C-alpha cells in the first residue's frame, strides 16, 4: 500500500475534504460525509451489497470503522425501523463512491443526514479495494478518520492519535453495547410493506424469547 493515496479527488463535490490515516502511516484522502469530526477505531471491511443501515447500526461493529466494498451506498435512504440498536456504536464509515440519492418508498431521511444525526464520521472517494486487500493480508489496523470543513489535517497528530489508541483486544464490548436494564417488550404490532409497523390488538400467537447472552 502506498504511503499516500488520493482517489477521485478531481470530481467536484458539495462535501468537505476528509482523510483516513492508518497505524502504518498510510494516508487516504477523500471527501468527508456525515458528521464533521474525528474518530479512531479498528478498520474492518464488509462485502454486503444491501443493508447498509442495519450494518452501521449493528452493535457488533462497536469501536470499528467500516470499509464497504460495494460502491453504491445510499440508494434506499434510511428509516426508523431498520436500526439494529437504539444507539449506533460504529466509529466511522468508508465508501468508494459518493453516496447515492435515495429512491425507495420506505426512505425517511437520506444517509448523509442520518450519519450526522448519529454522529458518524464518513469518507467517500477512497480506493476501498486496496484498503480491503490490505486488511485481508495484514489484519484489521487501527485508523483515524477525520472530516472538517477547512480540509487542513494535522497528519502527524492523527497518526499519533491512532498509535495511542489501545485497540479492541480484551475489551468486553458486549457489556458496553448491551442494555443496562431489564425490560419487557409489550408491543403488539403488524407489518406491511406499505405502512411498516402498526399497533394491533389482535393476539395470534404466544412467543417466548430467551436471551442466553
Language model segments and positions:
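RNA-binding accessory domains that recognize and position tRNA/RNA substrates
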Residues: 2-213
Amino acid at each position: 500500500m502506498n504511503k499516500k493515496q488520493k482517489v477521485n479527488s478531481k470530481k467536484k463535490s458539495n462535501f468537505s475534504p476528509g482523510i483516513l490515516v492508518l497505524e502504518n502511516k498510510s494516508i487516504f484522502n477523500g471527501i468527508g460525509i456525515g458528521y464533521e469530526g474525528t474518530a479512531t477505531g479498528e478498520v474492518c471491511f464488509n462485502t454486503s451489497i444491501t443493508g447498509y443501515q442495519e450494518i452501521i447500526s449493528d452493535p457488533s461493529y462497536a469501536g470499528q470503522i467500516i470499509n464497504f466494498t460495494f460502491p453504491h451506498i445510499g440508494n434506499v435512504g434510511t428509516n426508523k425501523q431498520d436500526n439494529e440498536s437504539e444507539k449506533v456504536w460504529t466509529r466511522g464509515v468508508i465508501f468508494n463512491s459518493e453516496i447515492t440519492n435515495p429512491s425507495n418508498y420506505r426512505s425517511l431521511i437520506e444517509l448523509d443526514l442520518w450519519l450526522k444525526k448519529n454522529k458518524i464520521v464518513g469518507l467517500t472517494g477512497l480506493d476501498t479495494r486496496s484498503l480491503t486487500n490490505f486488511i485481508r493480508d495484514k489484519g484489521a489496523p487501527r485508523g483515524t478518520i477525520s472530516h472538517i470543513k477547512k480540509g487542513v489535517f494535522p497528519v502527524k497528530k492523527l497518526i499519533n492519535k491512532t498509535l495511542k489508541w489501545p485497540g479492541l483486544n480484551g475489551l468486553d464490548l458486549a457489556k458496553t453495547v448491551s442494555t443496562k436494564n431489564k425490560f419487557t417488550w409489550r408491543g403488539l404490532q403488524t407489518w406491511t410493506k406499505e405502512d411498516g409497523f402498526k399497533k394491533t390488538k389482535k393476539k395470534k400467537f404466544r412467543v417466548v424469547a430467551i436471551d442466553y447472552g
